Amino acid sequence: MTAASTSKWGLVTNVVNSIVGVSVLTMPFCFKQCGIVLGALLLVFCSWMTHQSCMFLVKSASLSKRRTYAGLAFHAYGKAGKMLVETSMIGLMLGSCITFYVVIGDLGSNFFAPLLGLQVTRTFRVFLLFAVSLCIVLPLSLQRNMMASIQSFSAMALLFYTVFMFVIVLSSFKHGLFSGQWLQRVSYIRWEGVFRCVPIFGMSFACQSQVLPTYDSLDEPSVKTMSSIFASSLNVVTAFYVMVGFFGYVSFTDATTGNVLIHFPSNLVTEMIRVGFVMSVAVGFPMMILPCRQALNTLLFEQQQKDGTFAAGGYMPPLRFKVLTLSVVFGTMVGGVMIPNVETILGFTGATMGSLICFICPALIYKKAHKNAPSAQVVLWVGLGILVVSTLTTLSVSEEAPLDLTQGARSGQRGDAEGAMKVEAARLSVQDPVVVMAEDSQEKLKPAEDKEVLEQAQIKGPVDVPGGDTPKEKQEAAQLDRPGQGIAVPMGEAHRHEPPIPHDKVVVDEGQDQEGPEEKKPPPKLPDEGDPAGRGQGAPLLPESEKKQDPERGEEGKRPEQVLAVGEIERPQKIPEANGQPPVQPRKEDSRPGNRDLHPVPQARVSVELNDLVAGEGKESAQKAGGAPWKPMESAVESNIGGKAGLAVQRPEAAEQREKNEAEQPGGDQAGSKLEEAGRAEMLDHAVLLQVIKEQQVQQKRLLDQQEKLLAVIEEQHKEIRQQRQEGEEDKPKPADMQPEPGAAVLRGQEEEAEHAGAPDEHAGETLEDNPSQPLQPVLGAPRGHPAPSQDKGQHPLEEVKVLAGRDLADLPAGGSDTEPHGASSKLREDQKGAALKVAEAVRKLVPGDLEPVHKPDPAEVPKSPEKQLAKEVARQRQDVFGEGSQERKETGKDAVAPGADTQKEAAQPLVGAEAEDSHSKSRHSEPTKVPASGPAGMGFQAQARFRQEPQVIFDKSQDSHPEVRSEGPRGVGIPAEEQHRGRGAAAMQEEKQRPDPNSGPKLAVPGDQKPENAKPNRDLKVQAGSDLRRRRRDLASPPEQELAPKDGVIISFNSLPNVQVNDLRSALDTQLRQAAGAALQVVHSRQIKQLSGDLEEA
């Protein structure tokens, strides 16, 4: 039972969604036409008839086994019956679509026009309908399968209808529901409106097209279940309609029009409901277009099958599908544009197609199967009566409607001001129970006129204005009679002496009183607040409220209204000037945001000039508008809101004199000169920008030249490295160290080397620890010069990379920042692997005996002099490039370079050349491999590398050792001092093994320093040391030499050496990136320079 009840209420909800539509908006109007009692009875009667017709269809379907409306008609009456049903269905759907468009035009235009600052005109309404049909309705209608989303939208629309009902109820409370005054206003029974309202009621319940699909969707189709489902749905809808009709009619009584939403004052809730209606209606179009399109397809194109039946829901070719959809969408849009109001289209459609579909056809089909059916007879005759009488009644009333309803009501539909006035009239009528509604509105308006006259006399009395009070009264009457006061369309003299007068005068003063243009702009809003004026509010109060509200509006938006209010031909000429000059000021401000620091004075001057220009424009406008004595008086009225008559008298004269003086002065010339000055200021700004750009270009050229020099140096180093490889193969012993596991080898190498390492190694470790902040910067600054300690750590990655080429790939994710260097270096490795292997064999033989004894003395002694030289060269080069480089930076760079550099210099100078390229590629691999060796320190470095990934990439391209330095520097931060000393000790041990190249250590230190142009020899040393290390690593592949692996693990740190080559590749890329990046790179380079100089000083 639970599942069954759940499914039942789900079907009830779907049926209610299909029944409730925009016709709910016309319920108060129908109650007004028929009276409260008769309207409620008619609703109940139409609900009963709808239920009966639905049961006719269900019973006929159960007997004939047909599941479509057209199929039942064909079964009963042949092809004629099928065509009747299909044409009626098409007409009903088209009428519904037209109704949707009318509602969108009424509600949407009243909502969107004020937002856009436009008037609610017929042209805007047409434009809105076209935009909605093109942007919302058409895309949804062109979808073949939209039912799921449409149902969700329909459920959302039902929520809007519910909220709408509550708003109606609350409005009735607000309009005196419990005071009982409405009892004398409303009518209870009016037989005249029966035939006009019954078709609307009938169409409001139209759900016959949903009957058979719902019946077919039941798990166990039965007539009893269908009867309960539709009875529940119709009861809910009937209660909903009665509530909306009753409370809506009580709220607005005789002022009620076809679309009740138009009466509501503009506030957040009502605007939300209006927008909700518009969107629900727009989204509900496919619900109407889908069956309409299908019916058109079957009616026009479907062929009868051999068995005499028609295929239901056949496939529709794409072209036909699109043509039918377009014709329906835009055809109904034309109908929505042509038909004036909702009640007319609903009444006509309901009287014709609605009566056929809802009552006549179901009754005829049922009578064919069941001869004796009294209920079918009743429904049939009522339907025929509606078809004939209601059609005539609706057409006749629609012709008279423009005189009765649409003269005031249609204009009310086009403007919120009219609706608000009607609401106020209803509200006032509630307060006076004796007066009839029609008289009430007039009587309430006339006192408002009297108050208005008195108010204005109070302010303007002392001034002798030509025109006197008599024209004022006439003008006020004219304006109050006009429905669209909310629209700023003054009608000649009618506006001049009304509250809008300050509006016109303000336009004149706007130019004269240069100080407060915003205060004078309020007048355009006066017409918008014409309703309060009509209601008897004081005119002087309007300018203040407007002044508060006007600043929010843009000047441009207000001035056009002012032009309209003045109604003069010269006025439009002022507008382009006033609107054209403000853009000048914004442009200057826009061009300045980046250059405000450069030219603050020109900006201020320009703004002053612009203000003068605006003032000049105001004067010109005043001159053009000047000449009428009442205009100065208007300005006086606005300025003297307090009602000071004496001031009002004096000010008109001053204004007239001002206008005369201004007429004599050529304001256009002043404006032109000011524009020229503003243009000059802009030219200055542009010139400054050009200079800055030129300077940046010059700097970029310098960088490019330096990078080219670096590339040339690197090429020379490569050549020397190759030669040194050959020599190193013959001279250097082969290291007996093997690293079965790169991570373990690195750890062991660091430990052993830490033991063997001398003071220089310790010093190197200290330099890193002393400057914990440096590792972060070296990541960026590495391109120019990297401390040697990072290189020592880089040596470990070199060995690891060589030992495990495949593992490098696995480790790469750990050092994600190095993936790019790895790709660049892989090419170099392939070229140099052969030579490196040979060198490695020679290294194996030479290393074992030389490792320990050689290690300590060399790093301390040999590297210092070359390191200092390198540091100086680097500093000079960087100063040349960037114009920066302090002695402190050089010293720090030297300190960092010294320890690792010495060990690396001793390690292998000749080998550096051969292995530089390999280490180049491996260093990038080695950084990922370092991650396991260094542990969390490596992790921190990776995070840092990622954090500065862009700068690293840019500078790594220009400087080969940089990637190693990046990984090593941050690791140095994370790694304890002991590990750093160990790493350096390992480097020293390796250098001892590589003793044949005692100068390789300084060269290793140089790699960062060699990146400058002057560091060629240092790069050679780096390359040699790297080549030696690589050879040893390759030699270490043999198991007997694994024992020495921990020491050689330090060799991995030589990866920094290979970075020299990487820098070559990156330098080329660097040039391009720098060109794109511009000044941003310069900042990064400056940081690098600082770091390098600091490292040199420490060394």
UniProtKB/Swiss-Prot annotation:
It is a multi-pass membrane protein. It is found in: Membrane. The keyword Transmembrane helix applies. Residues 440-679, 720-1047 are annotated as: Disordered. Belongs to the amino acid/polyamine transporter 2 family. PANTHER family: AMINO ACID TRANSPORTER (PTHR22950), SODIUM-COUPLED NEUTRAL AMINO ACID TRANSPORTER 10-RELATED (PTHR22950:SF646). This is Solute carrier family 38 member 10. It comes from Rattus norvegicus (Rat). The lineage of its organism: Eukaryota, Metazoa, Chordata, Craniata, Vertebrata.
